[in-house]
Amino acid sequence: MPPKIDDYFIRPAAEDDVDALFHICLVTADAGADASALYSNPRLPGYVWAVPYLKFAPEFAFVLAKHDRVVGYVVGTPDTASFDKALGRDWWPVVRREIAGLVPSTEKDADVLERIANPHSGTPGLEETYPAHLHINILPEAQSGGWGRLMIKTMLNELSSHGVPAVHLGVSPANERAKGFYRHLGFEELSHGDHLAFVMRLDKPAI
């Protein structure tokens, strides 16, 4: 695990971090910018892109903290297909009960509610060649100092230690900063239909 630097440190995520994951996911959900005004329910993005990983793949969930405050996370799964099956069985039914009666009032509401009602991959077809996937989000205050790189490296090391051969992740085409970040780390960019993905083989890691 990376050392503490300037009071920041990376640690395994814990159940007590759930609220922080919901919050960070929301305030970075607009192509890296704050999406608070785009959702009527602030937990909607986290239901999809953050919290289920802590619940169903806790070995692959890490947070960046400053003192006792969580300021970023990286979450993932070594086996996308198995993870999706577990969510279909044990996660989405719970979420649907929690948001029962919620009527979408924004375009983003509608997008996430559709995804919850009919779960689907944002990068379809990649899981056969690149079975793992991940998500990372960091608050603006902690986006310098190389912490994003260290968090990705922490995740890739964990995946590699479990024999995972390759990983993929989806990126909003509008998020130019994220695209530059992944290119710099050695990920390969793939246009996959209407989706943009970055992939890496873990038998020859670039970082």
Predicted regions and their residues:
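Conserved N-terminal entry element of GNAT/NAT acetyltransferase domains
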Residues: 1-16, 204-207
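Conserved GNAT-fold acetyl-CoA-binding loop/helix
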Residues: 29-49, 86-96
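Active-site rim helix/loop that mediates acceptor-substrate recognition in acyltransferases
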Residues: 39-61, 67
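Conserved beta-strand in the GNAT
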Residues: 63, 69-78
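Conserved catalytic-core motifs of GNAT/GCN5-like acyltransferases
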Residues: 81, 168-171, 179, 183, ...
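Conserved acyl-donor/pantetheine-binding loop and adjacent beta-alpha core of acyl/acetyltransferases
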Residues: 81-135
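Conserved GNAT acetyl-CoA-binding A-motif
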Residues: 130-132, 159-171
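Conserved acetyl-CoA-binding loop-helix of GNAT-fold acetyltransferases
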Residues: 135, 144-158, 180-184
